[in-house]
């Protein structure tokens, strides 16, 4: 397939000269116009150029080695996808966040110095809840759904966190608490549990001899 989305320029990264900036050959999404410069790649294998895929590298972000950014995902500032990282489903990376090794994020948002490593995963839930990960968080396990992680939180390999509820679970420096969704403290009309229909009373005189 011909890459009509972007070209790799001769502008080398000041610290990693084997990486080069990209330049848009057409508009990409709402924020990228034809001719705009983007972040750095090692090859076309790092950033999708599928038709209608608005995945993009902004600012000084990097996608290198065999890392792949696709499905409308965007990297900003100095974020980095390296090694065999896989960034998909509208994920967003900013700050100095990193996805590395064999890790993946799907529908997640990373900020600050957040790091997904090893075989770690940050995934959106079936209901569309996106985990947000910031601060100096390190994830080696799985985080899926309505979570916000910050501070020095560490998710160990083998640890699996799932939350598909409206209430957001916050993990910060070893403390876990709940951020209740709006409306949880009020009563709503028409919401009740189903009650089984009452059985008819039996005729206790049936069969009795007087």
Residue ranges, per PLM feature:
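Terminal amphipathic alpha-helical/low-complexity segments used for targeting or macromolecular assembly
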Residues: 1-54, 60, 78, 84, ...
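Surface-exposed loop/turn motifs in large extracellular/passenger domains
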Residues: 49-58, 71, 106, 122-124, ...
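Extracellular beta-rich repeat passengers
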Residues: 111, 116, 122-139, 143-167
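Low-complexity, polar/charged sequence tracts that form flexible coils or short amphipathic helices
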Residues: 67-68, 85, 108, 125, ...
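Short, well-ordered helical secondary-structure segments
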Residues: 9-12, 28, 97, 103, ...
């Amino acid at each position: 397939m011909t890459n009509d989305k972007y070209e790799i320029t001769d502008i080398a990264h000041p610290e990693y000269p084997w990486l080069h900036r990209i330049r848009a050959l057409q508009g990409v999404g709402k924020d990228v116009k034809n001719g705009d410069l983007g972040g750095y790649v090692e090859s076309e294998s790092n950033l999708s150029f599928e038709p209608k895929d608005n995945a993009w590298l902004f600012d000084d972000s990097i996608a290198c080695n065999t890392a792949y950014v696709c499905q409308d995902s965007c990297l900003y500032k100095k974020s980095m996808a390296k090694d065999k990282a896989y960034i998909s489903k509208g994920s967003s990376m900013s700050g100095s966040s990193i996805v590395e090794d064999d890790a993946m994020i799907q529908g997640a948002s990373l900020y600050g110095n957040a790091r997904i490593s090893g075989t770690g995963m940050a995934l959106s839930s079936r209901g569309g809840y996106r985990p947000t990960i910031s601060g100096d968080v390190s994830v080696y396990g799985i985080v899926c759904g309505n979570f916000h992680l910050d501070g020095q939180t560490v998710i160990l390999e083998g640890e699996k966190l799932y939350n598909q509820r409206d209430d957001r679970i916050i993990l910060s420096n070893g403390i876990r608490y709940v951020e209740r969704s709006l409306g949880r403290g009020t009563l709503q009309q028409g919401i009740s549990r189903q009650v089984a229909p009452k059985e008819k009373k039996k005729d206790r005189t049936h069969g009795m001899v007087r």
